[in-house]
Amino acid sequence: MPLPFGLKLKRTRRYTVSSKSCLVARIQLLNNEFVEFTLSVESTGQESLEAVAQRLELREVTYFSLWYYNKQNQRRWVDLEKPLKKQLDKHALEPTVYFGVLFYVPSVSQLQQEITRYQYYLQLKKDILEGNLPCTLEHAIQLAGLAVQADFGDFDQYESQDFLQKFALLPVAWLQDEKVLEEAAQKVALLHQKYRGLTAPEAELLYMQEVERMDGYGEESYPAKDSQGSDISIGACLDGIFVKHKNGRPPVVFRWHDIANMSHNKSFFALELANKEETIQFQTEDMETAKYVWRLCVARHKFYRLNQCSLQTQAATLNSVRRDSSSRMSLPKPQPYAMPPPPQLHYNGHYTEPFASSQDNIFVPNKNGFYCHSQTSLDRTQIDLSGRIRNGSVYSAHSTNSLNTLQPYLQPSPMSSNPSITGSDVMRPDSLPSHRHSALIPPSYRPTPDYETVMKQLNRGMVHADRHSHSLRNLNIGSSYAYSRPDALVYSQPEIREHPHLTSPQSAHYPFNLNYSFHSQSPYPYPAERRPVVGAVSVPELTNVQLQAQDYPAPNIMRTQVYRPPPPYPYPRPANSTPDLSRHLYISSSNPDLITRRVHHSVQTFQEDSLPVAHSLQEVSEPLTAARHAHLQKRNSIEIAGLTHGFEGLRLKERTVSASAADVAPRTFSAGSQSSVFSDKMKQEGTEEQEGGRYSHKKSLSDATMLIDSSEEDEDLEEDSSREQAISAVSEPRLTAAFSQELNYPCASATPITGPLHIFEPKPHVTEPEKRAKDISPVHLVVETHRPRRDGLLTPSMSESDLTTSGRYRARRDSVKKRPVSDLLSGKKSAVEGLPPLGGMKKTRADAKKIGPLKLAALNGLSLSRLPLPDEGKEVSTRATNDERCKVLEQRLEQGMVFTEYERILKKRLVDGECSTARLPENAERNRFQDVLPYDDARVELVPTKENNTGYINASHIKVSVSGIEWDYIATQGPLQNTCQDFWQMVWEQGVAIIAMVTAEEEGGREKSFRYWPRLGSRHNTVTYGRFKITTRFRTDSGCYATTGLKMKHLLTGQERTVWHLQYTDWPEHGCPEDLKGFLSYLEEIQSVRRHTNSTSEPKSHNPPLLVHCSAGVGRTGVVILSEIMVACLEHNEVLDIPRVLDMLRQQRMMLVQTLGQYTFVYRVLIQFLKSSRLI
């Protein structure tokens, strides 16, 4: 078809990645190796860092970050919260990003993971060689001797030390003088001989300990000028912020605990000291530099504050027992014509770790129940020294083997790959004892092999089929690092191998075959030429060897392992995975982790994501059918029909409502028909699941294509379905009335009580249907009934009748109130934030279109007259994965069910809602709003005083139990000028350690909360309220929230306490925050401070309540409390029933979560939390 205006487009067969939608991030690692990742243009620096961490199998990512050279050729750390592409386009000199250590530690004993220590060693060595860390020549030679021993092993493996001439020994400052280099090489050779016998981890440890004692360790400085105009260098170090003068004056260090606040203004960077009422300013080059220095120092301070406790308590004891079996070994001398490779076998677990990282425990049951972690490959390879074997993918899946639980059989390690940062070794097979299963365990972070190289080696007979490990059943991808971080970007295919019966003589003594695998890379750690680009995703090595499956039945393995199916890949996947699956015609069907996981994608997403590999799946199908054994038949949660037609026949069983139930369901029901249809539906679902159990796998999808539920969970579901059938058969007549009453409630469901969530109510209110369902049902089958509405119809979320103008009148003295009475009486000020004025309920046709048909119908008094859909009518099950929960929440938002759900929750108690104390005339002026009052049985009672003889404050106790853990809150209004003394009395008497403030002092020119704590840095940093003296000790701004440390002193007794004040500063005047990650970080800060205070508090006040307040103490306060409780439900895998929890909260304080917008915001927060933690 011709284009208009005579335009012609050039037709090509090339596919070009558009720069507008993709970013190829080129990242240089600490060993000078380059990796590339294909990311989205919106991918943040954090996502790129996590991709690198996955590539390295690095879990302790806290200490590392990414940096680049700016256009002035200066190093700048990437802002991890912002898109990487925008930062590089705006500031970077070149698109290359570098991986390195950002936060240094006082002692390497803090580093738990071996790969973390190794990367840390590489960073320190780079700092020395590049001259970033100044040192003397003698010190550099000593460090070079340790580095040679760490990287090359014992000196007697080599005929001469000439290779040291090509090894980077000294800092760049001395590389120009050949005489100095020659003398230094001789001294290094002598030191190398002196250090003979040291293993690589021991040499690296000595190297890092030497560097730790050097001046300038962990420092990063920038040029600036002081107040006198003198040139200085200012930067951050371990202890604080240092200032080095260039005129010979001694350096000055401002320690972290002496710094009260840091700020920047234009090109000035300022420090506010806690002990002195002064501010020290420094002038940087420009405004961007001042902001960057401030951001870096704030990050260093936060790292110091969060880690100072753990730094003091961590032990640095060596585990000498594990060293014997997991240390790196020196290698024999290779053939004389070849340059000897660096003999470096990385050890596992040099320090005592909370998890086992060696195969030593493979025969011993783990009694402490810690997470056991294997990064090893026990696959011995017949090696020809004329070639190199590189085995392993970019990311090796971890194995739990038989470490977590005592099992009746011994299971060999999966054929996990061993990608490494530096080189490894080639060892003669005859030099290895075949009976030692754990003496040679290389780490699992070695370079990715080229697929063609592996195939050539296979063709040359370098890999023998009878020497492979033959188990893949326990490839625990879910516990690996790639699934423990949010939004991981890079995925690799695990190596899938099948093996015949073990016939070799050395394997007769053990029920598994012990194999070894060693790898090598370029012999020069610092080559002159550029390293080849290493792909971000490896090609799986698929070996055609027959499977021996009868020794280890898959169902037994699945029962003995604690398994959580990993979440699906996000769509669209940022990282490109390019294995040619169509060439691999044989793939193991013995691994339940790879082929039995629940499908989480929708049909459309599944089709779009999976069509490119349809051809390869068809080819894979038949070998799988042939290799399948009878006892390996497992239920499949999906059916794939018509694979050659583009997966049009994909049917999700668990999401499908049977046609018979749909046809039977009319528009309206009588009570009896509702109950019968409900029970029939359950029976049909159970029948479907039982029929599904007869299916066995005939087609397997790639792990990057789809995920299917494991057999263990299928069995549990089958038992649950049969149990529910029996329950429904017994309880059907009794549930008729209760079920018919609340049929329209979107979250009504029949659920066996497991006791995940408890409410502490002084006076419980249970209706008769609830009592009958609880008392009569033999297994406590409860239909989630709620209190009947006044008229059974939907009501607006907050109407003006709920907040009458007469109710807003408060008898306040003129000297106390901060606003004119006309504002109160005119309705301008309301406890409801963002509420339209009176008469604003009239909608134009355009407005009606905006609010959607469901909301419009509800506002006109129409309610649902159909059975709720499966996803609507039940809370999110505890068995659901994070991705399923996220999908259900998103569906409720998209379908408008959140609105209906919110409108059905009572705003106040209908019975026993007494507020008699709050309505007393003497307490009227203590209420910010006359219609937001605490219930008598839930209010916080103060010790009566002469000024407050009733002990009243507008605050309510809120208690909720999640998974046996009690969450205790105090929800209160923002203090008034005349209630500050009562506020601090409540803090003292209730033992409050954390105050969460979710408002500003003023918004839109109106007071939201009186400032009840003193400002930092002012002359009056101490204020007294009655018997309490409050002092501000420090304040830290962290973007969307500020953390302030307060000292509270009781003047009569002299006792002092520390109170943390966490103020969320990013809430807009109207609506809710847009930055969901920022709000989640605020909740994380609350959790972090709560853990800190609980660990340091006295046992009698081990769990003090969290005090939360906004202006009225119901809107934003309810959002914080509800969000934190629901996040706790997600973390403890409890039932996710948001409306029920909110109803519980409102039974303790009225009108919590005031508006629909706030309620929707809670959903968005939970969705963001699930998306961020879906890979954990």
UniProtKB/Swiss-Prot annotation:
Substrate binds at residues 1069, 1110-1116, 1154. Liver. It is found in: Cytoplasm, Cytoskeleton. Residues 809-819 have a biased composition (Basic residues). Belongs to the protein-tyrosine phosphatase family. Non-receptor class subfamily. Residues 668-703, 789-825 are annotated as: Disordered. The keyword Metal-binding does not apply. Keywords: Cytoplasm, Cytoskeleton, Hydrolase, Phosphoprotein, Protein phosphatase. One of its GO terms (molecular function) is protein tyrosine phosphatase activity. Residues 23-308 form the FERM domain. It is an enzyme of class 3 (hydrolase). This is Tyrosine-protein phosphatase non-receptor type 21. It comes from the Eukaryota. Residues 898-1169 form the Tyrosine-protein phosphatase domain. May be involved in the regulation of growth and differentiation of liver cells. It catalyses: O-phospho-L-tyrosyl-[protein] + H2O = L-tyrosyl-[protein] + phosphate.
